[in-house]
Each structure stands twice: as C-alpha cells, then as structure tokens.
Amino acid sequence: ADSGEVDQLGQILAGIADGSLAPMRPDEEPKGSSKPAQKKPAQKKPETQLAQTKPSKTKPARSPRVRTLVIMIDPGHGGEDPGAIGRRHRTREKDVVLAVARILRQELNEIEGVKALLTRDGDYFVPLQRRVQKARAAKADFFVSIHADAWVKPTARGSSLYVLNTRGQVSTANRWLARKQNDADLIGGVNLSNKDKQIARILMDMSMTSQVSDSMVYGARILNELSRINQLHRGKVEQANFAVLKAPDIPSVLVETAFLSHPEEEKKLRTRAFQRKLAYAIGNGILKGFGHKSRLG
C-alpha cells in the first residue's frame, strides 16, 4: 500500500467509531421518508384555489429531509487495459461494461432520492485503489463494479456476482496499521499508541465483517434479478479477494455480466437491448436492497 492508502486508515477508523461513514443498511428506508422512491415528477403550475379555508393557527410541520442514496458504479478496465476480448467479434470488455454502466447511471438518476456516479466516464484507465477512493469521497452507500467474464473454454457461460473474501483481510489491516505512524493513527480523535493497535484491528475487522454481510444481502438481490434475464454461471453469491471490493465502510459487489469467450453471450453483450437488460437487473437489485418500490424498465 502506498502512503495515500495508508493515510486513509485514520479517516476510515474515525468514521467507524463515530458512525459518520456508515452507509445505509439493507432494506433501510431513506431517513425522513416512509414513501417509496418515485420517478422525478415534472413541475406543474399550481391550480387555482376554488374555496377559501380558514387558516390554521398551528404552523405546518416541515417536510423532513430525505437522505439521498448514493450509488457508485464502476465500469471495469479502460484505457490501455481492454479487459477480456471476445473470441468471435473481438469485443472489448471495457467498451461493453462502460455502455452498461452509463445506462444504469442514467436510469438510477431518474429515481427521486437516488444519485448515481461513475468511476470512469470514458476510455481511460483508473487505478483500482482510486476507484475505491472515489466511492469514499462521494460518501457512497453502495459500490458496484461491472465486468464481463472470459474463460479458456468457450462453453463457460452465465452471470456471476462476487463479494469480498475476508480471509487474509486481517493481515491487510495489520499492514496498514504498521505503516501508519502512531501519532497520526486516529480513531475519533484519539491517538493510537501501540496499546491501541488491537482496538484498531478489532474495529477494522468488525467493519469488514459488517460490509461483507451487507454486501451478501445486496448481492443476492442483484443475482436474483440477473437470473431473470440470463443464465447464472453459479446459483449463489461468490467470494473473492478483488481489490475494488475492499472499502471497509461501503457494501461492495462485483458483477460478471456474461462471458465474452462464449460466442452466444458475446453476441448478446454487443447489443443495446441486452446491455439495457443488464443495467435494469443490476439497478432493480440495488433498489430492492434499499427498500425502494420503484423499478427500472
């Protein structure tokens, strides 16, 4: 890890301690609202009042502020990194996933109370750690990385979804802590001396455990939606040690949309219709996870 990654640990731990970095939990309603998200309505001219009513002496209650649900969408690869290459049509993964991500962003941003962002919006490379940093800087409630799979055998097919495998994650946290000077390691403004390192490790472990648990819930919703439009490669949420899934304070999933190495799936991935179906499936899984009643498509 470079010094930039290490310097983030104090901020992460401080947020864990005071709760300021905690994202929405699965099925949590946006704060201040019990109504489901709806499409943003067009502004209408106020209708003429036909009857005069006696004004109330009591002041009307202020409308509670609705918390915006922030979704960071990560189109994999980009620039000099094309990702997987299709066998028959030489379709590049970086192009397909960017198209899906752009559709997903556009559709989610039509939902009131939802804000969707991209880690890249063009054909350029973004380092993996920078993608995570962008999500944290935006205070994202959810992170979804979109990819297209490939395998040596052309028979492999289907959609997959991954969350972080926490095995070995404690050692990663230990390396971060070891690189950080004691006088700058802060949890809620408290200096982390050597005797406090164990506390920091415990907090990091608790945060990662919670992140993976929430990610599994969201992932299951998304995978169920994907099963409606495409065959699943495996019928369950899988776990792997992907670098882009390592934000300890943001539930994160990685979606493998289909196999570019499979001739039929490569052909489908090239079509706008299937790209839109994928975007809708991912978006609807996310919305369900956060308790929204609106659906894309």
Language-model region placement:
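Surface-exposed edge beta-strands and adjoining flexible/disordered loops or tails in beta-rich
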Residues: 1-27
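Generic hydrophobic, helix-prone segments enriched in Leu/Val/Ile
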Residues: 9-13, 176, 203-206
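Short intrinsically disordered coil segments
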Residues: 11, 176-180, 270-274
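Catalytic-core regions of hydrolytic enzymes
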Residues: 20-197, 208-220, 280, 296
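Active-site-adjacent mobile loop/cap segments within catalytic or ligand-binding domains
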Residues: 91, 152, 203-297
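Short, basic/glycine-rich phosphate-binding loops at helix/coil junctions
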Residues: 198-202
